[in-house]
A protein has these predicted regions:
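Acetyl-CoA-dependent GNAT
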Residues: 4-82, 87-88, 100-102, 106, ...
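Residues forming the Rossmann-fold NAD(P)(H) cofactor-binding site
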Residues: 93, 97, 101
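Active-site acidic-Proline motif in GNAT/NAT acetyltransferases
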Residues: 87-93, 121
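C-terminal "cap" of GNAT-fold acetyltransferases
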Residues: 8-9, 14, 19, 23, ...
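Short acidic, gly/pro-rich beta-turn/loop elements at beta-sheet edges
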Residues: 70, 91, 127
Length: 157
């Protein structure tokens, strides 16, 4: 397993984000069914990423194949972790933990000493991972306040 820094628009990164979107859309479909069009629009806006804001995108490469993805973007004087995803076929091997530690390394290399992130309450494995790595729950921030099931975390590095 290795890490490869890529541009946000790298086709392999785009494909992994698309797979993540399919998975999370299915995970939260029952919640979306009960929302108003205005709520849908607010959630969509909160989850939309403006590509020029991304300062680092990394892939997990396993046996020559891209199997994981994550990115960082500025959030005040911190960096925000975005789009952490490991392909289902390789889960359970510690790749997500290694990926998060790589993001922490990159942040420190950039002189950043705190990471924040947002996840959803149905992403139980992600929540367990973040908490096991020392991320602490914080108040829901920014546009994520429009997402009723949002959970936010911070870790001082």
């Amino acid at each position: 397993m290795t890490f490869e820094s890529v541009e946000w628009g790298d086709p392999r990164a785009v494909a992994l984000r698309a797979a993540m979107d399919v998975e999370t859309t299915a995970m939260y479909a029952s919640r979306a069914a009960g929302q108003t069009p205005e709520q849908d629009a607010a959630v969509s806006a909160a989850l939309t990423i403006d590509p020029p804001t991304i300062v680092h995108t990394v892939l997990v490469i396993d046996d020559g194949r891209p199997v994981g993805h994550a990115a960082l973007r500025p959030w005040g004087d911190e960096l925000e972790v975005k789009k952490v995803f490991i392909d289902e076929s390789v889960r359970g091997r510690g790749l997500s933990r290694a990926l998060m530690l790589e993001l922490e390394r990159v942040a420190l290399e950039r002189g950043i000493h705190s990471l924040v992130l947002q996840t959803g309450d149905r992403q139980i494995a992600a929540i367990a991972l973040y908490e096991s790595l020392g991320y602490e729950p914080i108040e829901v921030y920014g546009a994520y306040t429009a997402i009723p099931f949002a959970l936010c975390y911070r870790k001082s590095l």
